Amino acid sequence: MLIPRKVKHRKQHHPSLRGRAKGGTSVHFGEYGIQALESAYVTNRQIEAARIAMTRHIRRGGKVWINIFPDRPLTKKPAETRMGSGKGSPEWWVAPVKAGRVMFELAGVPEPVAKEALRRAIHKLPMKCKVVKREAGE
């Protein structure tokens, strides 16, 4: 699981998900990638499930890059608790992903295998995504 080793503050404000991503919107490392079409919080479990879905399909070949990291804690109060008495305890770690962000990249496998592996990974993510190919000039 992806979680930060050490954090300065245990609880944080929720980051805004409005607008489009400013950076990380093109494929840099691999040949193919998964680009978010909507904004959402992606948990560490969803990132791991997508990674496993990709690597199982490509078997031994290829290389996978994960361009997002869950560094923001989301808190939750226990069930049947009265309101007040402070903020809840941190429950899980999320990566705030804005629309347009390339989250995963893949290289070293044929195009049909890469597209199928990325399609399987998209099913594990909480937002609409598309498979993008590296452009010639990059």
UniProtKB/Swiss-Prot annotation:
Superkingdom of the organism of origin: Bacteria
Basic residues compositional bias, start-end: 1-21
Keywords: Ribonucleoprotein, Ribosomal protein, RNA-binding, rRNA-binding, tRNA-binding
CDD domains: Ribosomal_L16_L10e (cd01433)
Residue segments, region Disordered: 1-22
Gene3D superfamilies: Ribosomal protein L10e/L16 (3.90.1170.10)
GO terms, molecular function: rRNA binding; structural constituent of ribosome; tRNA binding
Keyword Repressor: no
Family per similarity comment: Belongs to the universal ribosomal protein uL16 family.
HAMAP family, sorted: Ribosomal_uL16 (MF_01342)
UniProt subunit comment: Part of the 50S ribosomal subunit.
Role this protein plays: Binds 23S rRNA and is also seen to make contacts with the A and possibly P site tRNAs.
Protein name: Large ribosomal subunit protein uL16
Record organism: Thermobifida fusca (strain YX)
